[in-house]
Every structure is written in C-alpha cells, then in structure tokens.
C-alpha cells in the first residue's frame, strides 16, 4: 500500500513540476480514465518534447519505459487495489466471479526485497521521465 501511495503522490509532483508540462497538458493527463492511462499520456507527452530525428531510438526508449510502467507501477497498483478491497489471501478477477491465480501468486510472493526493488526501479523510472521533461538535450546521459 505504501509503495502505491508513494508512486501516486510522486506522479502528481512530476506532472506539476515547474516547466515540465503546460497547464493544458496537465489537464490532458488528468482527464485520462485511470492511473495506467494517465502514466501513458505523461510518457507520450514527455517524448513529444524531445527535439530528435532518431525516431527508432525514441520508439525503443518509449517501449522500454512502457514495459517498466506496466511491471513496476501498474501491476503493483492492481495488487494494492486487491488488498484495499480485502482480498488478502485470494485475489478475485474484476467481476469477482472466480479467483485470479496470477494476481494471487504475485501477492503471495511479495516480500521486503521485491518491494525495495520496486522503490529503486520506480525512482529511476521517475528520474527518466523528469529528465525527458527538464533536460531535453542531456536526458539520455544518466540512464540510457
């Protein structure tokens, strides 16, 4: 729960970073339906700010960040939702008609080391997006 709260709070901080997004872009991001769509819009808008002609490189970086987003932000947020709805031992599917074995296994295998790994990877992910927004010419230097 703490990890997901940290991610959601730092997301809000990120999109409101001075000179990162315009007011119009922030409204576009916040208008998205759910956390996943908001993050995807944020990443896409961040890449739109780059002045590069190497579209293949941009596509590869965007794909990598989308994969990290899914694995280290969206999937853990779904586990948080299960815990918040009292599904501590057995996680149900979205319709609550049967057990979701994949999510149940993810929940059962959570430990301190994995959660610490989530925090570390998220911090790097967050910094990548921030660098795209703030350091247009040197964003690639530290992480990729």
Predicted regions and their residues:
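Short, hydrophobic, well-ordered secondary-structure elements
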Residues: 1-18
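Amphipathic, non-membrane alpha-helical segments in soluble helical-bundle scaffolds
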Residues: 1-4, 36, 66-73, 112-115, ...
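Polyanionic, low-complexity intrinsically disordered segments
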Residues: 71-72, 87-144
């Amino acid at each position: 729960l703490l990890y997901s709260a940290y991610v959601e709070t730092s997301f809000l901080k990120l999109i409101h970073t001075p000179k990162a997004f315009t007011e119009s872009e922030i409204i576009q991001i916040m208008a998205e339906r759910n956390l996943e769509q908001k993050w995807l819009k944020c990443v896409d808008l961040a890449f739109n700010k780059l002045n590069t002609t190497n579209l293949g490189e941009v596509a590869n970086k965007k794909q990598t960040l989308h994969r990290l987003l899914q694995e280290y932000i969206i999937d853990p947020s779904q586990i948080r939702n299960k815990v918040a709805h009292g599904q501590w031992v057995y996680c149900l599917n979205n319709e609550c008609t049967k057990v979701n074995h994949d999510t149940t296994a993810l929940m059962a295998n959570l430990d301190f080391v994995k959660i610490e790994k989530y925090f570390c990877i998220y911090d790097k992910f967050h910094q990548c997006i921030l660098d795209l927004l703030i350091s247009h010419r040197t964003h690639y230097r530290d992480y990729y």
